[in-house]
């Protein structure tokens, strides 16, 4: 399935490692298009067996799935004028760590054009408490197939 995954950058983090490992193992035996979109350009900490694009390319990413993992990336994807399905895979509850505008977080989490997937059952209560929305799915480890099947 045609998929773009948004990352902050390609430097080392637990989530980047998980995503790059998943992509590299998936594209080895698949003809599906999978690419990365990075919001900050950095040197990758590992080989990436997929195309890497800048965020401005998302407007021309049609008929696919765009997966973001941060609230601010989800805001960017929701603003794209394409017909791709938008997914927020909440790896961490970043709005509780980084200072963010409550209205921005609320608007993203309550947007019905965004499929909401969380990594842990521990994320369900804060989301429900903040915006009275249940996640569409819980996917414990980042897996393209599990995310696709949950949509």
Question: PLM ranges: what are they?
Answer:
Residues 85-91, 134-142:
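Short hydrophobic/aromatic-enriched beta-strand-loop microsegments
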């Amino acid at each position: 399935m045609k998929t773009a995954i948004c990352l902050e950058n390609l430097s080392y983090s637990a989530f980047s490692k998980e995503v790059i490992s998943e992509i590299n193992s998936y594209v080895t035996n698949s003809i599906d298009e999978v690419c990365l979109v990075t919001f900050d350009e950095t040197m990758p900490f590992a080989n990436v067996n997929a195309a890497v694009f800048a965020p401005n390319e998302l407007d021309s990413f049609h008929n696919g799935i765009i997966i973001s993992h941060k609230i601010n990336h989800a805001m960017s994807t929701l603003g794209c004028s394409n017909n791709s399905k938008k997914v927020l895979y909440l790896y961490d509850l970043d709005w509780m760590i980084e200072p963010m505008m409550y209205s921005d977080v609320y608007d993203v989490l309550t947007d019905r054009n965004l499929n909401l997937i969380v990594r842990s059952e521990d994320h369900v209560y804060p989301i429900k408490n903040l915006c009275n929305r249940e996640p569409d799915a819980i996917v414990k480890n980042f897996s393209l197939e599990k995310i696709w099947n949950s949509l």
